[in-house]
């Protein structure tokens, strides 16, 4: 990161790991902490910053991207604030947030074939949840995480739940399995509960223009 003209009396900041959380910390140390960019050291074992947002490659060697993050307008306020601090590489007068908004206005998600069965589009709007499933859902999101401890998702729902359209749409969106952590499931539900009515069309989903290394990590690195 380039030298910031604003400085304070802190000599140096060390950040362990080069993932998005560390890079965001560096941005705010420069912006709000008034620490010079040259006085921030990021300690990263890998030769590439970005953590799981480390997509890359070439036409000769192939490309690797460890998944993408689905954003939602109703949440991710802290991430969007970060976007608003970062100039767009192609057009520095605009920010990552400007480009994010522009792209999602141009390319709107509206899935027409959310589920397929026997080579035909299957009905997906009815999530198929019973009252018992709803009660289990309320319990799992209401309990403190230490109550869930090391339990699995399947410890909290009946076998019926895992045959519903809701589960098919949920697990294919967020790569969940019944044996995955109930705590992680709870966190995702709390983050994306506003998407429940839109699960069949994904109309609430928002994405970056390119893979998230090029759209998020590189612009931060190039500050």
Predicted regions and their residues:
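N-terminal Rossmann-like FAD-binding beta1-loop-alpha1 element of flavoenzymes
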Residues: 8-41
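Glycine- and acidic
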Residues: 10-11, 64-66, 198-208
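Extended hydrophobic secondary-structure segments that form protein cores and membrane-embedded regions
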Residues: 12-16, 40-47, 98-103
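Short amphipathic alpha-helical face segments that pack within enzyme cores
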Residues: 24, 28, 78-81, 215, ...
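Glycine-rich FAD pyrophosphate-binding loop
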Residues: 30-58
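Conserved FAD-binding subdomain of flavin-dependent enzymes
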Residues: 61-100
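Short beta-strand to alpha-helix junction loop
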Residues: 70-76, 202-222
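Rossmann-like flavin
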Residues: 89-194, 204-207, 215
């Amino acid at each position: 990161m380039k030298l910031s003209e604003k400085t304070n009396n802190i000599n140096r900041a060390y950040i362990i790991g080069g993932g998005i959380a560390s890079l965001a910390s560096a941005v705010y140390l420069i912006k709000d902490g008034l620490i010079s960019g040259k006085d921030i050291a990021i300690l990263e074992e890998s030769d590439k910053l970005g953590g799981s947002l480390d997509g890359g490659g070439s036409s000769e060697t192939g490309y690797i991207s460890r998944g993408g993050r689905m954003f939602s307008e109703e949440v991710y306020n802290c991430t969007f604030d970060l976007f608003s601090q970062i100039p767009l590489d192609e057009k520095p007068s605009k920010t990552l947030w400007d480009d994010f908004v522009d792209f999602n206005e141009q390319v709107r998600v509206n899935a027409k074939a959310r589920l397929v069965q026997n080579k035909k589009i299957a009905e997906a709007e009815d999530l198929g949840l019973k009252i018992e499933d709803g009660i289990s859902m309320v319990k799992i999101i209401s309990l403190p995480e230490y109550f869930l401890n090391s339990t699995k998702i399947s410890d909290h729902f009946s076998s019926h739940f895992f045959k519903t359209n809701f589960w098919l749409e949920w697990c294919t969106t967020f790569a969940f399995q019944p044996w995955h952590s109930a705590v992680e499931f709870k966190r995702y539900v709390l983050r994306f509960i506003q998407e429940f009515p839109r699960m069949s069309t994904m109309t609430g989903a928002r994405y970056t223009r390119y893979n998230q290394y090029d759209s998020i990590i590189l612009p931060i690195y190039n500050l």
